[in-house]
């Protein structure tokens, strides 16, 4: 069976750059929209929003990670490459772009939402979908409009 929904979702994401997504709490519906994005040539990167820390550092700058220790090991710092710029540099040649799909995004602050919306304007091949709440049906709106209204 072909995908029955999602054409308007892809068009709205391409025009807005970042979308606030409302999905039913039982889940499962957002998978068809992710499949629609992949069929249109986008690479999706699903992540959980809680625990990301400083979005600017995590997404676009090299950042240090300190692993947990029990007091018996040396305190170490591992350096990770920037998530978004690393994936954008390594996209397949025929890919339209990278879509960062943030699950449980309602825990992010207004400043973080505004930063994500601004980042999509800076990086043209980068798009963001943030699951910000629940609803009876899947619906979405531009993230910048949702932040302004909140």
UniProtKB/Swiss-Prot annotation:
Record-listed E.C. numbers: 7.1.1.-
Mode of membrane association: Peripheral membrane protein
Catalytic activity line of the entry: a plastoquinone + NADH + (n+1) H(+)(in) = a plastoquinol + NAD(+) + n H(+)(out); a plastoquinone + NADPH + (n+1) H(+)(in) = a plastoquinol + NADP(+) + n H(+)(out)
Pfam short name (any one): NdhN
Enzyme class: translocase
A GO-annotated cellular component: plasma membrane-derived thylakoid membrane
Entry keyword set: Membrane, NAD, NADP, Plastoquinone, Quinone, Thylakoid, Translocase, Transport
Primary location: membrane
Domain of life, per lineage: Bacteria
Matching InterPro entries: NAD(P)H-quinone_OxRdtase_su_N (IPR020874)
Recorded GO MF terms: oxidoreductase activity, acting on NAD(P)H, quinone or similar compound as acceptor; quinone binding
HAMAP family xrefs: NDH1_NDH1N
Family according to the record: Belongs to the complex I NdhN subunit family.
Summary of subunit composition and partner proteins: NDH-1 can be composed of about 15 different subunits; different subcomplexes with different compositions have been identified which probably have different functions.
UniProt protein name: NAD(P)H-quinone oxidoreductase subunit N
Taxonomic placement: Bacteria, Bacillati, Cyanobacteriota, Cyanophyceae, Acaryochloridales
Name of the gene this protein is made from: ndhN
């Amino acid at each position: 069976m072909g995908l029955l929904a999602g054409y308007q979702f892809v068009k709205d994401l391409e025009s807005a750059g970042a979308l606030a997504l409302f999905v039913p709490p039982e889940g499962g519906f957002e998978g068809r929209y992710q499949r629609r994005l992949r069929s249109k040539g986008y690479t999706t990167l699903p992540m959980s929003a809680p625990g990301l820390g400083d979005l600017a550092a995590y997404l676009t700058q090299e950042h240090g990670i300190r692993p947990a220790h029990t007091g018996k090991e040396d305190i170490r710092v591992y350096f990770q490459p920037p998530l978004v710029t690393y994936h954008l540099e390594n996209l397949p040649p025929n890919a339209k772009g990278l879509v960062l799909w943030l699950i449980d995004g309602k825990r992010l602050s207004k400043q973080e939402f505004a930063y994500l919306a601004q980042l999509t304007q800076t990086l043209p091949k980068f798009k963001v979908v943030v699951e910000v709440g629940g609803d009876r049906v899947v619906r979405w709106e531009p993230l910048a409009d949702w932040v302004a209204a909140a």
